[in-house]
Amino acid sequence: MTPLLQAEAKMNTSLYLTESIQQHEFNLTSPQSFYSSPSVPNSKNNSGIFSYNTANNSRVSSSDEFTTQQDGMNTIMYKNNISKTFEDDIFYCPRSLLTPEEQVVYQEIDKYYMEQALLTQLQISQTYSSTPKEEKIVKFNPYTSKSFSPASSE
């Protein structure tokens, strides 16, 4: 057995985690096909790079099933609207990393969003001011009345 295979054999590790009811086992193994030669017998069938076993030892992931799981994850991500296009992600990119042309484009987008925000605020304030309030009852103020004048008490 070569030193590389010995190191690889020592690299097989198990980690046990206890979560609520189930016990999970994680095995990290390197694929034997990359390192083994025909003269070295392979006593253990390590078809997977990373395997995940629950307490009932049902295999969830292997290198053969990896693409199937990735397709499943892509479906879930698409279903939950988690995946975004590059154009959506550029909004979270620091502006200093953009080219001047891209900065101009995104400044225009910022102006558009500011105008939309101002328009919605104006519409909200107009609907608030145009709602019929209680009619103002004008109270009699004798000091502003034309018929009342303290100087002309004669």
Curated annotation (Swiss-Prot):
Q: Where, per the database record, does this protein carry Phosphoserine?
A: S47
Print the keywords alphabetically: Phosphoprotein
| Origin superkingdom | Eukaryota
What family classification does the UniProt entry report for this protein?
To yeast YPL229w.
Q: Please, what other remarks does the record include? A: Present with 721 molecules/cell in log phase SD medium.
According to UniProt, the name of this protein is Uncharacterized protein YMR181C
